[in-house]
Curated annotation (Swiss-Prot):
Enzyme class per UniProt: hydrolase
Listed name of the protein: Calpain-10
Active site feature: 73, 238, 263
Domain Calpain catalytic: 13-321
GO BP, sorted A to Z: cellular response to insulin stimulus; positive regulation of D-glucose import; positive regulation of insulin secretion; positive regulation of intracellular transport; positive regulation of type B pancreatic cell apoptotic process; proteolysis; regulation of actin cytoskeleton organization; type B pancreatic cell apoptotic process
GO molecular function: calcium-dependent cysteine-type endopeptidase activity
Species: Mus musculus
UniProt key word S-adenosyl-L-methionine: no
One Pfam family named in its UniProt record: Calpain_III
Annotated PROSITE patterns: CALPAIN_CAT, THIOL_PROTEASE_CYS
Biological classification of the source: Eukaryota, Metazoa, Chordata, Craniata, Vertebrata
Length: 666
């Protein structure tokens, strides 16, 4: 998305025609509870809302996020990451923009949003949705601070409307605001039935210890997907911010881990043991109780580790980004200073092979990854939304409230697997039949999936896939590494091929043989000449298996299409008799060929698709005239009719998006 050029007449404030102050910017199809406010929402500029508007406050807490009527807590939690890093905030909200008291102020601001591999500038006017003269969506703790509602408007413009921000994943917003990666860690044992987990297992406790280590380096969010009975005050499908973690000792010497939770609603909602005046504080010294309670700001509360693991469902952690723009590992703190990205696509009938349960898995897009040194590597597959988020047609005329069903929120279940290979010329079926060195646990309905691994130097084959075959989609493959890397797409050999030479659908194993025609030695010409047996005689065989095999034989001469030295070429295929293994080439070539690719043609490449039974064969490539010199490659592609790879690929659960809005529930 390109920034809108804010060229306005003197003394006239900018009005964004691409995202106007109207219902078309508020709603997509009136499918959310926002529809009930349709007649009451007005648009005002900050100087019409308060006397002295400012972008950022002197006190950082006064700029903290606070949720309004819009169910976009997932986005607001990600915005909190910007407050932990000034260089990230400057990246998203470029400094030096004229404010309301500046003579250069013209009524517009520019933000940057990371979209599918690029930072895109988004310019908006500063007219904001209001109810009764106050901001009705996001706001800061001090309502005369406007960086947050302006950024929210820019994000809504990217998505097409404010209503499109209703429900989402914190991880997606973190990526859009930082360009980094984000991980989602489940706090529940997925092998247990929902709602029946009374005490967390050891793995979840280790997660909390990891969070304690990460608290100063990253944004950490936590979500409630389905609150337990007795904890309904947390809401359902709601996201929170973990502001702090404190490890302390009880009066009896027992270790206690407390987590400080910030609710974007802006009010305290927790009635657990560690609420103000709760029984949990009896375990610590009164001075420590006073110290920790004094740290609480509006909308914050303390939760003990056991309560946290019982009441919350998952945490989301954003990878730290250095001032140089490099990601830092969540697991080792090492800087992933080498980055490579490449786009790709799953095309129905061509490269949408599905998961490894399908025999057409090898048809999926494939990428070469080369490591020059031992490295920690993160490889991610980011899906492009199925719709263009901007400039879409909105269904507002005569619309009535309906169940929330916003397009673009659903993504395909995708996975990623990586194989170590010895070199770039490989037998693809053989490689893919072996266990991968790294792979996702299952195909997940995430916008972006990724895996982290420690890899040794060498070549690797990375294959992203959807769970179902023939499902179209576009993606961006991103690789982050501590060591030097190279990334390239595996290209099919289609140079010079005509539409008729394309391989039929299926799995093919390819072998290439190279040779040359030399005058007086191996340039025997066509079968019209007695010197024909002097031509190169290339052996190949059709192995035993399930009957005859389809074979595509292609002869390519090594010269440019525009080269005046293009020779007429062709080839014949001879079958070796079962008892003729020791038969010399000369006597074999005096027999009639089994099949031919003639007449000889002035072409860079000629080919023939045939059905051959099990046995041994000889291919004889030739030019039409004897003593015509040149070099060539013969490619033999054999169709493999193999059974499905029994890899027992699993399908992840559908994502629960967080959106809960407290004001309307209250």
């Amino acid at each position: 998305m390109r920034a809108v050029r804010a060229e306005t007449p003197a003394r006239e404030l900018f009005r964004d025609a691409a995202f106007p102050a109207s219902d078309s910017s508020l709603f997509y199809n009136l499918s959310t509870p926002l529809a009930q406010f349709r007649e009451d929402i007005t648009w005002r500029r900050p100087q019409e809302i308060c006397a002295t508007p400012q972008l950022f406050p002197d006190n950082p807490w006064e700029g903290q996020v606070k949720q309004g009527l819009l169910g976009d807590c997932w986005f607001l939690c990600a915005c909190a990451a910007l407050q932990k890093s000034q260089h990230l905030l400057d990246q998203v909200f470029p400094p030096g923009q004229p404010g309301w008291s500046d003579q250069k102020y013209q009524g517009f601001f520019t933000c940057r949003i990371w979209q599918f591999g690029h930072w895109e500038e988004v310019t908006i006017d500063d007219r904001l949705p209001c109810l009764a003269g106050r901001l009705c969506f996001s706001r800061c703790q001090r309502e005369d601070v406007f960086w947050l509602p302006l950024l929210e408007k820019a994000y809504a413009k990217v998505h097409g409307s404010y209503e499109h921000l209703w429900a989402g994943q914190v991880a997606d917003a973190l990526v859009d605001l930082t360009g980094s990666l984000a991980e989602r860690w489940s706090l529940k044992d997925v092998t247990k039935a929902s709602g029946q987990q009374d005490r967390p297992s050891g793995g979840e406790h280790r997660t909390c210890r990891q969070l304690l280590h990460l608290k100063d380096r990253c944004l950490i969010s936590c979500s409630v997907l389905s609150p337990r009975a007795g904890a309904r005050e947390l809401g359902e499908f709601h996201a929170f911010i973990i502001s702090d973690l404190q490890e302390l000792r009880s009066q009896t010497g027992q270790g206690i881990l407390l987590l400080r939770i910030h609710n974007p609603w802006g009010r305290r909602c927790w009635q657990g043991l560690w609420r103000e005046g709760g029984e949990g504080w009896n375990q610590v010294e009164p001075a420590k109780e006073s110290e920790l309670l004094a740290q609480l700001q509006e909308g914050e509360f303390w939760v003990e580790e056991e309560e946290f693991l019982r009441e919350f469902d998952e945490v989301t952690i954003g990878y730290p980004v250095t001032e140089a723009g490099h990601l830092q590992s969540l697991h080792t703190e090492r800087v992933l200073c080498h980055t490579r990205t490449l786009p790709g696509a799953w095309v129905t009938g061509q490269s949408a092979g599905g998961c490894r349960n399908n025999s057409c898995f090898p048809c999926n897009p494939k990428f070469w990854l080369r490591l020059l040194e031992p490295s920690e590597v993160c490889v991610a597959v980011l899906q492009r939304p199925r719709r263009r988020l901007v400039g879409q047609t909105r269904a507002l005329a005569g619309a009535s409230p309906a169940p929330v069903n916003l397009p673009g929120k659903d993504y395909q279940a995708v996975g990623l697997h990586i194989w170590k290979v010895e070199k770039r010329k490989i037998s693809l079926p053989r490689v893919l039949s072996a266990p991968p060195v790294a792979g996702t646990a299952c195909h997940a309905y995430d916008r972006e999936i990724h895996l982290r691994c420690e890899l040794s130097p060498g070549y690797y084959l990375a294959v992203p896939s959807t769970f179902l075959k023939d499902v179209p989609g576009q993606f961006l493959l991103r690789v982050f590494s501590t060591g030097k890397i190279s990334l390239s797409a595996v290209r099919l050999a289609t140079k010079g091929a005509s539409p008729g030479t394309a391989l039929p659908a299926g799995e093919w194993e390819t072998v290439q043989l190279q040779g040359c025609w030399r005058a007086g030695q191996t340039a025997g010409g066509s079968r019209n000449f007695a010197s024909y047996p002097c031509n190169p005689c290339l052996p190949f065989s059709v192995p035993e298996g399930a009957g005859p095999r389809y074979i595509r034989i292609t002869l390519q001469q090594h010269c440019r299409l525009s080269d005046s030295q293009l020779h007429p070429i062709g080839f014949h295929v001879f079958q070796v008799p079962a008892d003729g293994e020791n038969q010399d080439a000369c006597s074999l070539l005096l027999q009639e060929p089994l099949l031919s690719c003639v007449p000889h043609r002035y072409a860079q490449e000629v080919s023939r698709l045939c059905l051959l039974s099990v046995g041994n064969y000889r291919i004889v490539p030739s030019t039409y005239l004897p003593d015509t010199e040149g070099t060539f490659t013969v490619t033999i592609a054999t169709r493999i009719d193999r059974q499905s790879i029994h890899s027992q690929e699993m399908l992840g659960q559908l994502l629960q998006e967080v959106s809960f809005m407290a004001v309307m529930k209250a």
